Amino acid sequence: MINHEVRTHRSAEEFPYEEHLAHKIARVAADPVEVAADTQEMIINRIIDNASVQAASVLRRPVSSARAMAQVRPVTDGRGASVFGLPGRYAAEWAALANGTAVRELDFHDTFLAAEYSHPGDNIPPILAAAQQAGKGGKDLIRGIATGYEIQVNLVRGMCLHEHKIDHVAHLGPSAAAGIGTLLDLDVDTIYQAIGQALHTTTATRQSRKGAISSWKAFAPAFAGKMSIEAVDRAMRGEGAPSPIWEGEDGVIAWLLSGLDHIYTIPLPAEGEAKRAILDTYTKEHSAEYQSQAPIDLARSMGEKLAAQGLDLRDVDSIVLHTSHHTHYVIGTGSNDPQKFDPDASRETLDHSIMYIFAVALEDRAWHHERSYAPERAHRRETIELWNKISTVEDPEWTRRYHSVDPAEKAFGARAVITFKDGTVVEDELAVADAHPLGARPFAREQYIQKFRTLAEGVVSEKEQDRFLDAAQRTHELEDLSELNIELDADILAKAPVIPEGLF
């Protein structure tokens, strides 16, 4: 890996085009390096993982709405892209929007956390849609996805967005554009222009994840994927981008991030170096913000222990979660969001409330992507009482481990201190989720398949499940990427909410 220093350059400075970060990323994307076998296997795992959460979310309103947007844009010339659940082909950028929304809706797919947050599986829907549009095969798709993960993960390692209240999809637009560039074997300059356009059109504020969180949380990465496809299309037609997009005097760093004098360090693979960043990412066993994965497992375990000791949760006086800066301020009481304690809050808000999540997991000693968020569950009187006794505090040691570059030390956990009214104190901690590569039950192919089977049950026919799993595990051999789509029976889709007509 090569560490690249990135800073603002005034327009009067000499700053060669080849030194622009977008150009360096484009060179990585254009590098025809082979994808290693373990990387390919993990990409296949994540294709399966995305399909799992699409199956679980397909009947939800935001996903049904996004699907309706794609359905009014059918393509009949043999091109286009597939939409999860549907037969036929649709405009690729709108298929990417529909599929991306389904992937993100339940907060249930993969994650990478460093200086910034990310869900790099969001790269897959736009890259797959572009591949289907262009008639590419599985080997090309895998190369494109490897690039998408590589670029997003390394931007996340080196450039914090949230401290300036910029949403993390600003790293996704460029990474998806770069991945599509790899997929299509585009030249460096075309990829460079596409990256610049994709970044320019996907910078947005973090209000999408603050306060009363709406369905836009699911649409945001899907929209970035749509923008990346359109950016590539324009660049292929010879259109340019604002440049230098990151380093310009009126660019992203100068006015949206840390300003004129700040230097970021972005690691990127050297020429000929394999793209392996996907191996540093991790998926979710539970449908909730990643920083709550270990606390959910901790709560389940502590719930069992408290019950075995005869301790009653109704006698709890307080619960304090000692955790990292990010966890405290994003999903904890450091956010100062009263909505995180509101039983009438949206599901999107509750899955960003570690207080709600820990209370329910502690009581139920389990977590379910639907039942744990049901309105009747959130309104349970004893849950509300327990929920309001929970707070978070930042612990410098957890913050240090969160940002550690040592995989053996990096952690996203918490220490829970439960104090009962009689003075009894019970505490425990968990550094990483059970499903984490270093956890109690690390996810491998078997677990990805089980997650798919579990979430697809009652939605996807068993025959279609078998067909998809066979195709997905042969992605590198596929010539027709429509095999990676899943079609649902009409009676299943009929259960989706009725969506009002839009403009189109």
Curated annotation (Swiss-Prot):
Keyword Nucleotide-binding found: no
Keyword Lyase in annotation: yes
Reactions it catalyzes: (2S,3S)-2-methylcitrate = 2-methyl-cis-aconitate + H2O; citrate = D-threo-isocitrate
Keywords of this entry: Lyase, Tricarboxylic acid cycle
Enzyme superclass (EC): lyase
Coiled coil, from the record: none
Entry's EC annotation: 4.2.1.79, 4.2.1.3
Subunit (UniProt): Monomer.
Family: Belongs to the PrpD family.
Function recorded in the entry: Involved in the catabolism of short chain fatty acids (SCFA) via the 2-methylcitrate cycle I (propionate degradation route). Catalyzes the dehydration of 2-methylcitrate (2-MC) to yield the cis isomer 2-methyl-aconitate. Could also catalyze the dehydration of citrate and the hydration of cis-aconitate.
Name recorded for this polypeptide: 2-methylcitrate dehydratase 2
Gene: prpD2
